[in-house]
């Protein structure tokens, strides 16, 4: 199957998108462009501001409108923060801001059987680091490497 990714927001989202692409490639799937026909589309969202939320909704709506037969999956802070709004947009797979390996498995299950899947958790209660593969070596001179996951409620801008 062929999947495409659209990433909004921070370096963590960029890293996690690269890791999910890597996981799909390891399983024998292809990664395509968001503008071409694919079996599934993943939108990794940001929710740091109201403007970011508006961009999320616009990208999700456009993707659903342009690809009515494809599986559309949304993960990241927006779906973690407001899963009801994401459900209302008719999304097939909804994941939060963690558990990327499980999210990829849900994506593959939904794409194979065209069914709805959800996996959300308490982001602030998450204490275990999810080890994901480093990515970005093909297109960049530097790879991103995630060294921390979770939160101790110290930042004022994060969800």
Residue locations for each model-derived region?
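Proteins enriched for Cys/Gly/acidic motifs involved in redox and nucleic-acid/cofactor modification
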Residues: 1-159
